[in-house]
């Protein structure tokens, strides 16, 4: 009886191996599902990027507004009857108190 039980237990383990660890087993299916989810997310990001790029291409092909905007912001170009004005942030205020003079040459600070 013990021999039959041991044999059936080994047979059960042999049957379980492909289910969990074999080709097409649960672990591989779970891993593939994670990969598919990651790829779907990447595809959605790329679709959104492509849609944005298609809109830019359409604007560049159909009108001069997009070209003018790029020339102004990316290349700093202006029209003939315009003047270029650039606003610069004010420099940070410096301290009004002067720094102490450096020690005379030849003397070292003792700690």
Swiss-Prot record:
Intervals, Periplasmic compartment: 22-111
Region annotation Disordered: where it falls in the sequence: 89-111
Transmembrane segments: 4-21
Subcellular localization: Cell inner membrane
Keyword Protease part of the UniProt annotation: no
Record-linked PANTHER family: CELL DIVISION PROTEIN FTSB (PTHR37485:SF1)
Protein name: Cell division protein FtsB
Protein species of origin: Ralstonia pickettii (strain 12J)
């Amino acid at each position: 009886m013990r021999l039959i039980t041991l044999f059936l237990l080994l047979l059960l383990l042999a049957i379980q191996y492909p289910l969990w660890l074999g080709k097409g087993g649960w672990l591989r299916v779970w891993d593939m599902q994670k990969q598919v989810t990651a790829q779907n997310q990447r595809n959605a990001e790329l679709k959104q990027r492509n849609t944005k790029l298609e809109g830019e291409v359409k604007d560049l092909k159909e009108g001069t507004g997009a070209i003018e905007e790029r020339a102004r912001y990316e290349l700093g170009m202006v029209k003939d009857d315009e003047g270029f004005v650039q606003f610069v942030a004010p420099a940070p205020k410096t301290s009004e108190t002067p720094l102490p003079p450096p020690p005379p040459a030849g003397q070292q600070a003792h700690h």
